[in-house]
């Protein structure tokens, strides 16, 4: 049976195109930056929301980095929460400007499945964009933890881009 050279070229083009599509989908990244606003008097609500995700991410070979302002993670709490003690790293007592900078560096490396940082103030658009780029580059998740007091929460405007843990009673 005779096939024209055009038909052969079309099938080789189709094969090459499918290889390009396959390579481009393999290289897509799934980084994520999210803010979690929680009430200081209800820290358990935040744990209920985040622990299942952190437990699942703990199954990866990568680390989990906690950038905490002053408090130190309890070894007992980490184990009781079902998080892998051998994959949890903590750096404490960072100033807010160093927290964002450290998050960007850590996310960009790809060594961490998740980077969690505490900030009292809102991110600037530039800081948020920098974090998103770093998370995409490292294929990692970043969580900005923002505590609010019960009294200030009532006057704060709700944003659809933030997770407000007090909505999950």
From Swiss-Prot:
InterPro entries from the UniProt entry: Cell_div_suppressor_SulA (IPR004596), P-loop_NTPase (IPR027417), SulA_CellDiv_inhibitor (IPR050356), SulA_enterobact (IPR047696)
Key word Cell division present: yes
Residues under site feature: Essential for degradation by Lon protease: 169
Renumbered residue ranges of the record's region Lon protease binding: 162-169
Post-translational modification: Is rapidly cleaved and degraded by the Lon protease once DNA damage is repaired.
One GO BP annotation of this record: division septum assembly
Region named FtsZ binding: 106-112
Keyword match Calcium: no
Induction: By DNA damage, as part of the SOS response.
Superkingdom: Bacteria
UniProt keyword terms in alphabetical order: Cell cycle, Cell division, DNA damage, Septation, SOS response
Function, in words: Component of the SOS system and an inhibitor of cell division. Accumulation of SulA causes rapid cessation of cell division and the appearance of long, non-septate filaments. In the presence of GTP, binds a polymerization-competent form of FtsZ in a 1:1 ratio, thus inhibiting FtsZ polymerization and therefore preventing it from participating in the assembly of the Z ring. This mechanism prevents the premature segregation of damaged DNA to daughter cells during cell division.
Family membership noted in the UniProt record: Belongs to the SulA family.
Known partners and oligomeric status: Interacts with FtsZ.
Name assigned to this protein: Cell division inhibitor SulA
Native organism: Escherichia coli O7:K1 (strain IAI39 / ExPEC)
